Regions:
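Phosphate-binding site of ATP-dependent enzymes
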Residues: 6-115, 141-143
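ATP-dependent carboxylate activation and anion-phosphoryl transfer catalytic cores
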Residues: 104-188
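A conserved helix-loop-beta module that forms one wall/lid of the active-site cleft
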Residues: 1-4
């Protein structure tokens, strides 16, 4: 991807291009070379009262954490970057990232990633459902890429739907629970 630069000359050239193309400052971040994950969170403190599947939700905080999905973009059309071009590919198609759900992670890392996603959801006051994208830094520490407060819901394609399917949650049940949670917020 052109957005990844390897030296100061490339950085200066790319920043100049961004500033000239978009007529605004450029954001420069350190590239995180570690594994990439996405973690879905659904619910709220009273989720069990509105859900058709109260057993999905944690007794302590009312949230459901979906299985962790790992994205491996090393063989995608944009190696090592989960770009729009890579996302546009269908699961399993040549040039698409590889998806592993549930991801094979150590129990301690699983706990960290799920807590990280939960905290991001809470801190942003997200409603009902969100999906947090996380990458590990060179020391293996989780770092926030972004939080999606309106995650995609395309069946057999969108990350949250792949996570739900990995634990046996039917697509219709996922959608209905999101709708029931939203309706409950409005007293419906």
């Amino acid at each position: 991807a052109k957005a990844i630069v390897k030296n100061e000359a490339e950085l200066r050239e790319r920043v100049k291009w961004v500033v000239n193309s978009y007529q605004q400052p450029a954001l420069v971040e350190t590239f995180l070379s570690g594994r990439e994950f996405t973690v879905g969170v659904m619910g709220r403190a009273d989720a069990k009262l509105y859900s058709r599947h109260p057993e999905w939700y944690d007794d302590k905080d009312g949230f459901h954490r979906f299985p962790i999905l790992e994205l491996d973009a090393s063989r995608s059309v944009t190696p090592h970057v989960y770009s729009q071009a890579a996302k546009a590919k269908n699961v399993g198609e040549k040039g698409a990232p590889d998806y592993f759900c549930p991801a094979e992670v150590e129990p301690e890392l699983e706990k960290k990633l799920k807590h990280f996603a939960y905290r991001a959801h809470i801190l942003l006051n997200a409603l009902d459902v969100s999906r947090t994208d996380i990458r590990l830094d060179d020391e293996g520490n989780p770092r926030l890429i972004e939080i999606n407060t309106l995650p995609g819901l395309t069946p057999d394609y969108s990350d949250l739907c792949l996570q739900a399917a990995a634990e046996g949650i039917a697509y219709n049940d996922l959608l209905l629970d999101i709708l029931y949670l939203a309706a409950g917020r409005w007293g419906l």
